Amino acid sequence: MNKKVIIKNIGLIDYKEAWDYQESLFDEIVSIKDRNRKAEVQEESYNYLIFCEHPHVYTIGKSGKLENLLISEDFLKSKGATLHKINRGGDITYHGPGQIVGYPILDLDNFGVSIKNYIDGLEEVIIRALQHYDIIATRSAGATGVWLDADDPIKARKISAIGVRTSHWVSMHGFAFNINTNLDYFGYIVPCGIQGKSVTSLEKELGRKIDIEEVHQILKKEFSNVFDMEFVMK
């Protein structure tokens, strides 16, 4: 199994441009897998882990409902935001500057995980990353993502959202981890379609600005620990 992963930090990038880039890497891996089914000599495919940030944007997954966007499209535009309906699982979420978005484009056959275990693994990466800041985070029953005080109906707040797409056992999309995020933008939606729950950020929890590059390095370490990845340059 090839657990080599090419990691790229592409910085601030338009959502559609990043989506197209994901699709190209996804299609590359699927094509190699298809060729390998018929070939005597197996061709090696790479896995990818992309870190980036986006300008203000809302995305709605396949099961999402437009009524969970609480503002008109005109008001949305006045806030400098865009809206995209996309092919991941889940409902509506927000991406913006100060938020780390991670797109693992992986051949899951290489990692020996089910789709459920893969999503659990993404959550585990974030949970472990938060431990570096002495923050205890957990999963929440019946909801994806990473939460603080998940069992307290009043205090429960989400710090990382997760939504993925898989086909041919290849993954795309991934997670959004609130670091220095402007949380006001979450007030214009019902985040992930879950009523009555709030969101938070690492900055809000610690009361200070966070070095995003430091978080990148922590995430890289925990991806390696959780998925036994070997990072390579290309």
Features from the language model and the residues they span:
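N-terminal lobe of the biotin/lipoate ligase/transferase fold
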Residues: 1-156, 210, 232
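C-terminal accessory segment of soluble enzyme catalytic cores
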Residues: 147, 184-234
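Glycine/proline-rich loop-helix segments at beta-alpha junctions forming the active-site rim
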Residues: 157, 176, 181-184, 190-192
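Histidine/acidic-rich helix-loop-helix segments that form or flank divalent-metal centers
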Residues: 159-162
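Conserved phosphate/anionic-ligand binding catalytic regions in large, soluble enzymes, centered on
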Residues: 167-179
